[in-house]
């Protein structure tokens, strides 16, 4: 059971393109489940890095990691070809998403940009399958095995990174007492620093600036980690447009009431 489920394509995307999200909602006492859509079994140290990053930003629960391989592609078709090299199909890619929604019953699901941020095929496949999963996860005729195991379930909301409709802008630059005065974005920077193998990539300068000049999430304009669109809702559209939990009551609060 999770208030928020984030399906990150790779082991550092949760700290990069979703920078600020995990520490922000962790600081608010949310139950958060992180899922990784690819498994870096060809570079096993990244599994350790992802755990160190999650613990740094306040996540309490172990993630779920799929068995889908990680290879670069630029299209959904290309991504499907990469997972096919290990015997997986489009149906498997969709079924995994449906299973995660039914298993963890998130009130809010969060997905990658439909265009894959910088164009990565696995980001695109992840987002496309999440969209379809939200549409069918409440129907027991789809993937009946997981329907029988977990029951059917439809999230109350789906937010898609950079989606152009029903836009919200998150504030990750306000200091948090939960993190000793650091902002959620600053915590994600510390989380990304745990990904030692990725410090020589262009992602570091994208997040920090070439000379460390980026100190706020709001300074990042390309693939902004602050911008999302509400793709699906069963609890009404957002009015304040700055909080994924607008119109949502945390599971813990529901139990208290």
Q: Where are the predicted features?
A:
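Active-site beta-strand->loop->alpha-helix modules in alpha/beta enzyme cores, enriched
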Residues: 1-143, 257
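Metal-dependent de-N-acetylase/amidase catalytic core
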Residues: 1-7, 90-257
